[in-house]
């Protein structure tokens, strides 16, 4: 086991505080409409330019192990806030730094760290309750666009696009952000359920110009195994032919004799038909087939359920008003499923999303939820160069997360004003002087975001904060973008409550742990062994006669 270096008390806290300051100082320059960019070196390719707090925090790795521990703990504040609210990472970092700095001073003055932490927690709970009480619910598309615009650093086009996407696919729908191949940023909305499997044979195409197979008012057969034997399939095909309706077959695979017969029947015009592979793999494939069955009002034909393909009747097949199949994708629009059953399935998937701990699983479950609940919108972010596209994509991601958070818990006045006002409303009382000091730490610390936003704009923070607090209106504040005071909500300068609340709770949680640290342990760097000397020369060859 390697030897360890242990630091105690004040020495440990000073090192840790230095790490916190280095990380926070790099992150906080990005805060607000006049925040600056940070350039990050990449081991390959062009450097990355970003204004996204968590992206900056993730890149900071310090040489000194004790300083690095402080920086990594503050990085955790940004990461946790990003995971929960998707935005507000810079605000969380600024709050974390402010609480740690104030707390370290109090501990150095001889106060009890545990009581300070209790005081901090008391005050934070009161501020959170105050924010939730003041929250204004979002109702209109314009308000959604305002939140998106603020988070995208004042770019109205992005705000509008997000509002439009949310209007089309609903709050449950999935909105994905991709890099465009062109310089333009555009929005594409897919109605209904789409999955990434195309037709198994180009002979199924009904529109040769667009190379798509369109089936109107179609039956849908869902089978979880491979289909290669024609005999088992015949009863279903005969029943569908009688109805003169098209048929879509979704199975693990359709091959051999079965596929050849389907193609021949399609070409002869006796049967409008198309076949695609089922989406996903393993258990996820079963779940997605079940989703399609519920959406279309059909059943999955599965040996597990004791249903054989030969005994399938028309009422076991799903129905949809329109099915469109391209080379890569299949879209099912207007399935005939019961609304109550779809809602129950949506509820079940939401429950799974809450319970899962893996990001990948959560992402896949959210995709399934969107396909059932609304649809999918794709925002393709364009730009002149790759560096610009990446920077813009960061902002669109933040804006999208902020907008979702705003719809969930409502909005408050932006620009750090909501926290600034809350600092004057804290009435909590500690049971001793040290807890009172903890409450006062929060009073001062929650002014930090508003001060940092004005500092980044080159203004005098104390003057502006004083002027805002002189006015008694909850929504009165300073618009850093144009240097004017006014009603921030009507100006569209708003913050989602969930983002502000999460930032404060995470900052206080980690800062409380840092303040109460009394010892730090890190591995000592390994000393390189001295290089071995060169071997000695050969001895003399004495005593040899020639």
From Swiss-Prot:
It comes from the Bacteria. It holds the Pfam family Cpn60_TCP1. Its EC number is 5.6.1.7. Gene3D superfamilies: GroEL (3.50.7.10), GroEL-like equatorial domain (1.10.560.10), TCP-1-like chaperonin intermediate domain (3.30.260.10). The keyword Isomerase applies. GO terms for molecular function: ATP binding; ATP-dependent protein folding chaperone; isomerase activity; unfolded protein binding. One of its GO terms (cellular component) is cytoplasm. The keyword Isomerase applies. ATP binds at residues 30-33, 51, 87-91, 415, 495. Its main location: cytoplasm. Together with its co-chaperonin GroES, plays an essential role in assisting protein folding. The GroEL-GroES system forms a nano-cage that allows encapsulation of the non-native substrate proteins and provides a physical environment optimized to promote and accelerate protein folding. NCBIfam families: GroEL, PRK00013.1, PRK12849.1, PRK12850.1, PRK12851.1. Belongs to the chaperonin (HSP60) family. This is Chaperonin GroEL. The gene is groEL.
